[in-house]
């Protein structure tokens, strides 16, 4: 591809793994970076539960409380349909979208580590404002500060993980971001469950967002930036020191550093206009397609709206407030367990196997929820659901969450973090994050209205999308397991379809210097 990098290979075009153990230093470094997902996960999990707390609703959304009191049979799907209530959740993602675009340039100019520090500070400020909110304006401002933190952290952390991790461990370590996101969701749901028992519990739930913010802020202060970022900013000596520390004995640090330096030299030749190159140049077509497709499909799995609104869905099918919150805790725990299992096998069996299995599970689950709600709640929401069927809805929702945790949960962060060449890596990640946040805003703002208008068909809608994305991944995604970042163009150039766009890397001996083409 134009602006690509020729890295050392073994003579048949395949990339060389420069080695590197799973050292204590790389584990600690990646744990701190991945903890950015903890804050995002906490914010994902907290808003849906808080939205079911009656003291919170009475203070900020009294119209919803009146609608709940006046609800008659036939209105179960529409009780929570409030644009103001969904704006409380979705405002975070408008701010995150804007911040992610700015963060692309900031990440390139100041480094990944500095952006994570900024993200932690913004998260802390947002948690403080929402925790002490006295009106809707303060709630929205606080959520927007949290959104700016999301935009910065989601831009920097996956890149940090992908660039720091040894090739053979890159999938598992990059998936750590989603693992911590799932941990954050579980912490949020447990917090909501216990906080709902006191009138001021909603303040506790919202304000505690500041706690994980302190973790990433202080942790990031002590991190060294990634070798790629240091080389891009002209500090090759620190880049070498960083590689020596995180790779350990036995790694060919000098060869890896040479590859990074050459990649950065190519990146500087086309430093400006990365977005324009992605859009205009034929050889960048695979990266452009996946920069759009990955975040779009990630959102259309339906897991985001389930994470936000599952307490409201559970109340819709007949559970009380506490039972609905406990159901959300169970969902978070299921997601976390499946993420742990996925992380253990992602670098053994590859990415595509996990996508296929997870996709099949999610389709079955969404169809099951649609069928039960259509048969038991009725087309107009006029029927009361028997408890066994309500439990089945929870079970199918857990199954969907399990499928997501096995596949798109970790891989939705792993794939975008590893497929882009260095000259468009920041731009590609910015596009991935901004599209994802933009679609999250659209979905969170529209889901309750969709549930009210399309009723059980909402879940069939998501099942259809999961079927589409599973076929797309099977056909168009090359397997990236075990491929060094600097050699990623090789797998695209050999793919049955993308080879007409991407270019094969010329063969060189392992000790030959690399160049550009």
From Swiss-Prot:
It is a multi-pass membrane protein. Keywords: Membrane, Sugar transport, Symport, Transmembrane, Transmembrane helix, Transport. It comes from the Eukaryota. Its main location: membrane. The keyword Cell cycle does not apply. Signal peptide: none annotated. Residues 1-25, 105-120, 165-170, 225-288, 347-352, 411-430, 478-517 are cytoplasmic. Mediates active uptake of hexoses by sugar:proton symport. This is Sugar transport protein MST1. It comes from Oryza sativa subsp. japonica (Rice). The gene is MST1.
């Amino acid at each position: 591809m134009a602006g690509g990098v020729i890295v050392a290979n073994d003579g048949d075009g395949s990339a060389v793994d420069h080695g590197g153990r799973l050292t204590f230093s790389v584990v600690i470094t990646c744990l701190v970076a991945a903890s950015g997902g903890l804050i995002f996960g906490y914010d994902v999990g907290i808003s849906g539960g808080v939205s079911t707390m009656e003291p919170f609703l009475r203070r900020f959304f009294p119209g919803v409380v009146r609608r709940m009191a006046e609800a008659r049979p036939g209105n179960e799907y529409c009780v929570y349909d409030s644009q103001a209530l969904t704006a409380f959740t979705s405002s975070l993602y408008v701010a995150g979208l804007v911040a992610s675009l700015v963060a692309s340039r900031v990440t390139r100019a100041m480094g990944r580590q500095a952006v994570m520090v900024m993200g932690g500070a913004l998260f802390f400020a947002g948690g403080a404002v929402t925790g002490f909110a006295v009106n809707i304006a303060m709630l929205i401002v606080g959520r927007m500060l949290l959104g700016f933190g999301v935009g910065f952290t989601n831009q920097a952390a996956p890149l940090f993980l992908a660039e720091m991790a040894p090739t053979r461990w890159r999938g598992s370590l990059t998936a750590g971001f989603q693992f911590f996101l799932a941990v954050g969701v579980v912490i949020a749901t447990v917090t909501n469950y216990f906080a709902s028992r006191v009138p001021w519990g909603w303040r506790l739930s919202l304000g505690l967002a500041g706690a994980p913010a302190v973790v990433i802020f202080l942790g990031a202060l002590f991190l060294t930036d990634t070798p790629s970022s240091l080389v891009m900013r002209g500090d090759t000596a620190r880049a070498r020191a960083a590689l020596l520390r995180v790779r350990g004995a036995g790694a060919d640090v000098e060869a890896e550093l040479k590859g990074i330096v050459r990649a950065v030299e190519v990146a500087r030749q086309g430093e400006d206009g990365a977005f324009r190159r992605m859009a205009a140049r034929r050889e960048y077509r695979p990266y452009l397609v996946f920069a759009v497709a990955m975040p779009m499909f990630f959102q259309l799995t339906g897991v985001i709206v389930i994470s936000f609104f599952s307490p409201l869905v559970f109340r819709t099918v007949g559970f009380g407030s506490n039972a609905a919150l406990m159901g959300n805790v169970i969902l978070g725990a299921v997601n976390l367990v499946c993420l742990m299992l996925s992380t253990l096998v992602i670098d053994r069996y590859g990415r595509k196997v996990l996508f296929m299995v997870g996709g099949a599970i999610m389709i079955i689950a969404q169809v099951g929820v649609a069928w039960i709600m259509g048969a038991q709640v009725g087309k107009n929401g006029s029927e009361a659901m028997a408890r066994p069927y309500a439990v089945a809805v929870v079970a199918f929702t857990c199954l969907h969450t399990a499928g997501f945790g096995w596949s798109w949960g970790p891989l939705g962060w792993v794939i975008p973090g590893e497929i882009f060449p260095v000259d468009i890596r920041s731009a590609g990640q910015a596009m991935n994050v901004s599209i994802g946040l933009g679609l999250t805003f659209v979905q969170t703002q529209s889901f309750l209205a969709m549930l009210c208008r399309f009723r059980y068909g909402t879940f069939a809608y998501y099942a259809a999308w999961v079927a589409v994305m599973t076929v797309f991944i099977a056909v168009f995604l090359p397997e990236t397991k075990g491929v060094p970042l600097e050699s990623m163009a090789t797998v695209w150039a050999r793919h049955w379809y993308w080879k007409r766009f991407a270019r094969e890397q010329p063969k060189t001996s392992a000790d030959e210097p690399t160049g550009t083409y």
